[in-house]
Regions:
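Conserved acidic
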Residues: 1-478
Length: 478
């Protein structure tokens, strides 16, 4: 390494297990490593880009080790490509904001700084109440991951969930995906702090008077007896792996927290009605409480700025080098997604290098041991109490709103009218197709056995006009 190097970006195909390359592989190598280097911090969670911060003990020089995948996910770049992409991305961002700008090591930190720079003057960035913020964090899913096909393991299912497609061969595999869904979901008022905790009566009155008001509701609901489709309201799992499920078994009752958009969709679909001897009867969803957000528009300008950056990248490179365009636009979209998650960041995970298992303090609870390929413990991870978050940028209520709006849009999405170019009166999405053709929902992607017309390009009579937030066909396998 050059004696002034402060950043090392690892490129190419990188192993999924960061301990296989970021940490010494034996206790002996650990002792040798610790003679020369001090570990300032490690981030090593499976499935996430690894980072390491080190200080050379003799020269007191700091060195950060990153992976190119953190900024450019899904792109296997050479060092030359990574250097070019880093510089070009820096130029595009600086051009759009019209000032000198250095690209930060992490896309989330970069996005947060751009958000603070582009936040409208009308938004005062009121801090989120820590207790309400924590409540929102613990009651809000991000993506929806759901296999709709019978996998043959009923013992692993939640009592209130059932597959809607039997096991068996399928005629086709169709991949429908949302285009930059988070950006496309920012169409109305997102809302933000200050937030107000509501009683059951106050929550009921707010939703009745203004169902579109940015809010979260604590409700008790029962899946209608006539329902025969995927579920609409998220509930935390109680068995099997952690996460969420969407109850769809008629007659099952649950309590949960939902976003206003999710609740409105459920009621629009008739979840407040039930069969009676003389026809449908009202069976209201019961309100148990709520959290009311303030009507503000905290991120639309920031989202528009990132969309402008994507346009700049496409105009500069689309005709010259489509691969370059993909690298740059994917990085910018990734920055927005990661930044939304950064707004709801939880307690950090600390990774500590050890010589052997006896070096782990006896009072450390709930740690995960990291082992090398021979089974020796070389480090351990544990969750640490979060430092006081930046009150300007810790906004789990904003993240929860965008996640919920994106989930709703995947189920019930606006489509373009091919004759007028405006939004059609009909909708697309997972709820607007034959449920027996629905294989799975994976975030803002839908896997199905038939091509939905609304997911085709406008030129082919469909509803995809190329705008962000549209669901469109990405691939078909016979």
């Amino acid at each position: 390494l050059h004696h002034n190097a402060r950043r090392l970006i690892v490129c190419g195909n990188i192993p999924d297990q960061p301990q296989s390359w970021l940490l010494p592989d034996t206790p002996a190598h650990t002792r040798e490593f610790n003679q020369d280097w001090h570990v300032r911090g490690l981030f090593m969670l499976v499935g996430r880009p690894a980072r390491g911060r080190f200080t050379h003990k003799e020269t007191d020089r700091n060195l950060d080790i990153l992976v190119a995948d953190e900024w450019f996910p899904g792109q296997t770049l050479t060092p030359v490509q990574a250097r070019w992409a880093w510089r070009e991305l820096t130029h595009i961002i600086a051009t759009r904001i019209d000032r000198d700008w250095a690209l930060m090591d992490r896309p989330g930190a970069e996005g947060i700084n751009l958000w603070k720079l582009r936040t409208p003057e009308s938004y005062l960035m009121e801090p989120m109440d820590p207790e309400l913020g924590a409540l929102i964090q613990h009651t809000s899913p991000q993506h929806r991951y759901e296999l709709c096909v019978d996998d043959g393991h009923p013992e692993d299912r939640e009592q209130g969930w059932r597959p809607i497609v039997p096991a068996g061969p399928i005629p086709n595999f169709v991949y429908v995906d949302g285009r930059f869904m988070y950006a496309g979901s920012v169409t109305g008022e997102i809302g933000a702090a200050p937030a107000t905790l509501l009683s059951a009566t106050e929550a009921h009155d707010l939703f009745t008077d203004d169902p579109w008001h940015p809010a979260r509701y604590h409700v008790r609901f029962t899946v209608p007896s006539w329902w025969d489709d995927i579920g609409l309201l998220p509930v935390k799992r109680t068995k099997g792996r952690a996460g969420w499920f969407w109850p769809n078994v008629p007659g099952t009752t649950y309590e949960t927290w939902v976003d206003a958009a999710e609740l409105k969709l459920a009621i629009d679909e008739g979840w407040d009605t039930e069969f009676g001897p003389d026809g449908p009867v009202t069976k209201p969803i019961e309100f148990l409480g709520g959290i009311k957000l303030t009507k503000v528009d905290p991120i639309r300008g920031w989202v528009k700025t990132i969309q402008d950056m994507i346009d700049i990248a496409e105009k500069r490179w689309a005709d010259k080098n489509p691969t370059a365009t993909t690298i740059l636009t994917s990085a910018l979209k990734n920055m927005l997604r990661v930044t939304i998650g950064q707004m709801s960041a939880s307690n950090p995970v600390t990774t500590t290098v050890v010589y052997d298992a006896d070096d782990i303090p006896s009072d450390t609870e709930g740690f995960d041991a990291i082992r090398n390929k021979t089974g020796d413990i070389v480090a351990y991870q544990y969750e640490t109490a979060r430092r006081r978050p930046d009150p300007d940028t810790w906004h789990p209520e904003i993240a929860a709103r965008i996640w919920a709006l994106s989930r709703v849009r995947t189920l019930n999405t606006p489509i373009a009218d091919p004759t007028t170019g405006k939004n059609a009166t009909t909708k697309g999405g997972a709820l607007r197709m034959n449920s027996r053709s629905l294989l799975a929902i994976h975030g803002d992607a839908i896997y199905t056995t038939s091509v939905p017309t609304w997911a085709l390009p406008v030129a082919q009579g469909g509803g995809d006009d190329g705008k962000d937030g549209r669901l469109r066909v990405k691939g078909v396998l016979p």
